């Protein structure tokens, strides 16, 4: 049975995969994440998830390698990590009363057989109308400077929302576990029987 590799150093993705109680290792992929000119959000996350998984194939030649990438889209534009408090406040003000869509690309690459499975999972976050004071308080308390969209749904960010829509709530944090379990089963690796 091939061993499992998570092509990520994200503590959030690691924590999500740990929910499945299956043994795995993490390794940092070496991938240029720059979008290509005219690349649509779905294409971008799919390409990057695949590239992350396949970038580790030489190091891990008999493994199942999981790659994942996520972007946040508001009004048709990719919204990145804010990096500053001012930018975080601007992003949250723009999201207020609107729908933010997260696209998470998932790839499972069998480095022994060369078999690749991919999927893109969308997840919609409906923001409630936020006051300037609420935005300021949230940014001060949660400090979401390294989170796409300027919020952490697994923390206080849940108080910003009116509704969440998607097949798998884990998708919003960065790793669609329902889709991953389906892919693993197609490779003969059932998380319930490990």
Curated annotation (Swiss-Prot):
Transmembrane segments: none annotated. One of its GO terms (biological process) is nucleotide metabolic process. The keyword Isomerase does not apply. CDD domains: Maf. The record marks 12, 70, 154 as: Important for substrate specificity. Pfam families: Maf. It is found in: Cytoplasm. GO terms for molecular function: nucleoside triphosphate diphosphatase activity. One of its GO terms (cellular component) is cytoplasm. Its EC number is 3.6.1.-. Keywords: Cytoplasm, Hydrolase, Nucleotide metabolism. It catalyses: N(7)-methyl-GTP + H2O = N(7)-methyl-GMP + diphosphate + H(+). It comes from the Bacteria. The active site is at residue 69. Its cofactor is a divalent metal cation. Nucleoside triphosphate pyrophosphatase that hydrolyzes 7-methyl-GTP (m(7)GTP). May have a dual role in cell division arrest and in preventing the incorporation of modified nucleotides into cellular nucleic acids. Belongs to the Maf family. YceF subfamily. NCBIfam families: maf. This is 7-methyl-GTP pyrophosphatase. It comes from Salmonella typhimurium (strain LT2 / SGSC1412 / ATCC 700720). The gene is yceF.
């Amino acid at each position: 049975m091939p061993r499992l590799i998570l092509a990520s150093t994200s503590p959030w993705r690691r924590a999500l995969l740990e929910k499945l109680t299956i043994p795995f290792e993490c390794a940092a992929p070496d991938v240029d994440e720059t979008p290509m000119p005219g690349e649509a959000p779905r294409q971008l996350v799919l390409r990057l998830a695949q590239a992350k998984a396949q970038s580790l194939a030489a190091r891990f030649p008999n493994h199942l390698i999981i790659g994942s990438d996520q972007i946040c889209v508001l009004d048709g534009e990719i919204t990145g990590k804010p990096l500053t408090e001012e930018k975080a406040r601007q992003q949250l003000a723009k999201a207020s009363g609107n729908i933010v869509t997260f696209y998470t690309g998932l790839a499972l690459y069998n480095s022994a057989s060369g078999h690749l499975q991919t999927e893109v999972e969308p997840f919609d976050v409906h923001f409630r109308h936020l006051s300037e004071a609420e935005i300021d308080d949230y940014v001060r308390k949660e400090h979401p400077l390294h989170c796409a969209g300027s919020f952490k749904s697994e923390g206080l960010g849940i108080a910003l929302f009116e509704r969440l829509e998607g097949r798998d709530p884990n998708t919003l944090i960065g790793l669609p576990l329902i889709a991953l379990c389906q892919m693993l089963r197609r490779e003969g690796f059932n998380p319930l029987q490990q």
